[in-house]
Structure formats: structure tokens, C-alpha cells
Amino acid sequence: MTEYIQDAIPAKLAIAIANPIFPQLDSQLRAGRHISIEMLDEHAFLMDFQTELESFYRRYHVDLIRAPEGFFYLRPKASTLIARSAMSEMEMLVGKVLCYLYLSPERLAQQGIFSQDDVYEELLNLADENKLLKAVNPRSTGSDLDRAKLAEKVGGALRRLARIGIITRVGEQNSKKFIISEAVFRFGADVRAGDDPREVQLRLIRDGEATTPTLLTTEAIEFAEDGARDELEESEAE
């Protein structure tokens, strides 16, 4: 039996699976997490065993992707055997704004640290406020309560993006400050085309193109099903 297993599994893949890093890393990838170079051990592990793990994940109908910026993630195919869920329009839009901030001069000026308020203010700056408020509440009158609900939605989107490695919290446990990972370019595939990156992001956000059905399909980030945890986090935040 042991000989059969050794014959069926390439030696280097067997070494990868036996590594103590693998179980937790595998769970993170399946839950939609992006593994950037800041995660030193996990990233080095994926670099060492990239070819073998690409073959391993293909069996589940998902692709292990290494983006041009160097981060890794799993991209499910339509026939995937791993449960998945797509991002909401608000999460996609907040991701686009984060990419815009990542490319901004302010990132260097602020030592790469942003806050939830920065994202909210930039979103109102770049997008049509009335459309945003209507998206949250179709009967919006532009009241302070409507704006509070929008801010709450932005906070929820940031929590989801933190969980998948797009941003990393800094400071105290409940801090609303964070740094943006290069994995934010999951939301900026279109900025690699050669045009000015900030201008491309700005156009997408201002013209309402950041969450079109086409972009939601082609750039969708998908997750393992963890809705129960989302609801718990949202209830704790209220």
C-alpha cells in the first residue's frame, strides 16, 4: 500500500503535503486568502513547491495563481469541487478604491497606513454619492442615517478584504487602521494594460464601471462559504 501511494504521489508533492505549514496554508487558500510576500514562511513555501501544488489543486478544478506582483491565490473554475461565493458590488468597489489609494502618493506620505475613514472619504470623493446611497437604500434621502449605513457597508467590505489578505490591520485589536497589500491588484487587472494606473482606476470608479457585470465576472474574487462568520462579525460591529 505504501509503495502504491509513493508511486501515485510525486516525491516532492508528498514532501510539500507533509510539511507542517501545509494544512493551515491550504485552509487559508481555500477560504480565498491571498498569500503575499509579507507572509514570509507561507510565501517561501509556495515558491518552493509551486509546480507541485499547481498540479495538486488542479485535481479540485482550481488554479493556483502567482500574480505578476508576486502574491498567490486560488482561482476556482466553473467545475470547482471547492465551495465558493463571489464578492458583492460594494466589496468590489471598495477594492477598487483601495487599489487607487495603493497607487497614490499619499501611501508613501502616510508610511503606507490608511484608515476606514480614509477609504470612506475617498469613495465619496471619487464616486457619485447619491448613487452610493441609493445602492445601500433605494429610498435614500441623503440623510445622516443613510450616510451611516453606507459607512457601515464600507466597514463590512474592509473586514472581508482583511480576511482574504488584501489589507492587514495595524495597531490595537479593534483598530480601523491598516496597510494595503500588493494583493490589492486583484482589483486592478485592468491597470496593467499600460495606461496611467491611477487614471484607469479613477475612470472605473467615477464612470460606475468598477462593478459592472463584466468586471464582476472577470475579476471576481471567490471564497469558501463562510457566511456565518460574516454575519457574526457584522453583528459584533453593530
UniProtKB/Swiss-Prot annotation:
<comment type="function">
    <text>Involved in chromosome condensation, segregation and cell cycle progression. May participate in facilitating chromosome segregation by condensation DNA from both sides of a centrally located replisome during cell division. Probably acts via its interaction with MukB and MukF.</text>
</comment>
<comment type="subunit">
    <text>Interacts, and probably forms a ternary complex, with MukF and MukB. The complex formation is stimulated by calcium or magnesium.</text>
</comment>
<dbReference type="GO" id="GO:0005737">
    <property type="term" value="C:cytoplasm"/>
</dbReference>
<protein>
    <recommendedName>
        <fullName>Chromosome partition protein MukE</fullName>
    </recommendedName>
</protein>
<dbReference type="InterPro" id="IPR042038">
    <property type="entry name" value="MukE_N"/>
</dbReference>
<dbReference type="InterPro" id="IPR042037">
    <property type="entry name" value="MukE_C"/>
</dbReference>
<dbReference type="GO" id="GO:0030261">
    <property type="term" value="P:chromosome condensation"/>
</dbReference>
<keyword id="KW-0131">Cell cycle</keyword>
<dbReference type="GO" id="GO:0051301">
    <property type="term" value="P:cell division"/>
</dbReference>
<keyword id="KW-0226">DNA condensation</keyword>
<keyword id="KW-0159">Chromosome partition</keyword>
<dbReference type="Pfam" id="PF04288">
    <property type="entry name" value="MukE"/>
</dbReference>
<dbReference type="GO" id="GO:0006260">
    <property type="term" value="P:DNA replication"/>
</dbReference>
<comment type="similarity">
    <text>Belongs to the MukE family.</text>
</comment>
<keyword id="KW-0963">Cytoplasm</keyword>
<dbReference type="GO" id="GO:0007059">
    <property type="term" value="P:chromosome segregation"/>
</dbReference>
<keyword id="KW-0132">Cell division</keyword>
<dbReference type="GO" id="GO:0009295">
    <property type="term" value="C:nucleoid"/>
</dbReference>
<dbReference type="InterPro" id="IPR007385">
    <property type="entry name" value="Scp_MukE"/>
</dbReference>
